[in-house]
């Protein structure tokens, strides 16, 4: 059976191989000087980390006391610690309240793995003995409702749907009403995912938030954005737009197993000061893992 650490290492291989091999090449029989530091900086930027994050890492890297003879493994160890520091803002866990309804608003663009992620989370919490409900608020896409229905059956979760093309906010409201009535522990609200630069979608999300607050002024408990790791630099735009509409509390990153742009996670966490709750490293339910910044940082540099 593959361990979590090994599965993460395997998932990050497209990014980590590039960084690891780059470091090996830069520091092969070379000293740490202005030239090698510049090469290292370019390598990290090419992995889709932001310029600001890389600049911070390089400045801290210069302060590390190395022996005269420096090798690539020593560099990787130092880098892993510095990347972990940059990810310190991601360390806030995904917490739920006991004895009350937790409302989780889940948003993201089409194709990011939003509905699948909800299904995995629903299955995970159902297996822990929680009563789970799912509100299908992507009412303009029949396929999304069907997909969510399959996941809800698998997770033994209550499914709340509306008529095709119904107002998504009305479905969210009814989802909360039913969840309160049936003493549900966790309600996941699946939302539409049309392109993030479409004003109508952002208005729709804002309306959902406004409507559910009528039943609970503290709702949603969490507003989570699901990001496809393959997206790369466009991730920054997505986070900014969805954050404006829903006041995000955290992130979930999917498809790390298919991405060569995993470095973008470091920049996004640092820029927006948002925790990264879960990462998707495969298609199975158990492949949605709680994010561990220590393991991620070490695997990212090939350790």
UniProtKB/Swiss-Prot annotation:
CDD domains associated with the record: FtsY
Domain of life: Bacteria
Record-listed E.C. numbers: 3.6.5.4
Catalytic activity: GTP + H2O = GDP + phosphate + H(+)
GO molecular function, one term: GTPase activity
Topology with respect to the bilayer: Peripheral membrane protein
UniProt-annotated binding residues for GTP: 108-115, 190-194, 254-257
Subcellular location as annotated: Cell inner membrane; Cytoplasm
Gene Ontology cellular component annotations, sorted alphabetically: cytoplasm; plasma membrane
One Pfam family it belongs to: SRP54
Main subcellular location: membrane
BP term (GO), one: SRP-dependent cotranslational protein targeting to membrane
SUPFAM superfamilies from the UniProt entry: Domain of the SRP/SRP receptor G-proteins, P-loop containing nucleoside triphosphate hydrolases
NCBIfam families named among the record's database cross-references: ftsY (TIGR00064)
The family this protein is said to belong to: Belongs to the GTP-binding SRP family. FtsY subfamily.
Function: Involved in targeting and insertion of nascent membrane proteins into the cytoplasmic membrane. Acts as a receptor for the complex formed by the signal recognition particle (SRP) and the ribosome-nascent chain (RNC). Interaction with SRP-RNC leads to the transfer of the RNC complex to the Sec translocase for insertion into the membrane, the hydrolysis of GTP by both Ffh and FtsY, and the dissociation of the SRP-FtsY complex into the individual components.
Name of the protein in question: Signal recognition particle receptor FtsY
Gene: ftsY
